[in-house]
Amino acid sequence: MDSYGDTSGRIGRDWLDRHDEELEQELLDDELNLDELFGPEQEDAPGELSRRRYFRELFRLQRELVKLQNWVVHTGHKVVILFEGRDAAGKGGVIKRITQRLNPRVCRVAALPAPNDREQTQWYFQRYVSHLPAGGEIVLFDRSWYNRAGVERVMGFCNDEQYEEFFRSVPEFEKMLARSGIQLLKYWFSISDAEQHLRFLSRIHDPLKQWKLSPMDLESRRRWEAYTKAKETMLERTHIPEAPWWVVQADDKKRARLNCIHHLLQQMPYREVPQPPVHLPERLRHADYVRHPTPGEIIVPEVY
């Protein structure tokens, strides 16, 4: 069991991570801005990832993601990336950093709810198909058709025949996607028992995060070992050349984000596409233009 000092340190890092999440949107992508915030650059201690280095690497990788986006649009490439892992493993965090500076018309997130009564009667993969990309699009699945191999298996939401049929079907389904020109990447975010315990406690005691905890999440915690067995079976039976699994060590949230983004960029045959210069046109002005005052009753009160 972790000592009080270890737990206290982890809680502190979790708080700092939430603070840095706000900074990510506010900081400019330049070294001067980082100098003002963190002071002159110093060498990281062995095994440590400084906040300054994290921001620098995140911004660098996000610049590459913009290049990837431009290349996808230019070439009509189609990309699907699946993010799987236990509850609180950090899937949403890396998805947020990937999409943070991208065009939502090009890169979108698919996070499907539990199937409704009608969807439960469909071909299992049917409800996912409508979310697949057209040319020039990237789709990030925050959980995916692998729910059947994980939560549905562990919680008893599918029977043995449905479970086995999934394993018979999913390799062919993913090979079909590959033949259609879709590049498919599959990531499993791996966290330890102790780390999930800490992250759940953080959510329980943070009013801004309690919404992230569902009764299903709490039950999944109790069934940790069953999830381990389900995960191992899934990776073994669905790791195929056309769509291999990649495991992200995710106990350290920031390292996991950087490692995952760096890896997915390496899997893409993208290049920088020259962009035409953008010129701001002069505003047209007409002699008879009048801007009428806005009625006071529809103006939002300036409380702040």
UniProtKB/Swiss-Prot annotation:
GO MF, one example: polyphosphate kinase activity
Catalytic activity from the UniProt record: [phosphate](n) + ATP = [phosphate](n+1) + ADP
Signal peptide coordinates: none
Enzyme class name: transferase
PANTHER family xref list: ADP-POLYPHOSPHATE PHOSPHOTRANSFERASE, POLYPHOSPHATE:AMP PHOSPHOTRANSFERASE-RELATED
Physiological role: Uses inorganic polyphosphate (polyP) as a donor to convert ADP to ATP.
Family: Belongs to the polyphosphate kinase 2 (PPK2) family. Class I subfamily.
Protein name (Swiss-Prot/TrEMBL): ADP-polyphosphate phosphotransferase
Organism from which the protein derives: Pseudomonas aeruginosa (strain ATCC 15692 / DSM 22644 / CIP 104116 / JCM 14847 / LMG 12228 / 1C / PRS 101 / PAO1)
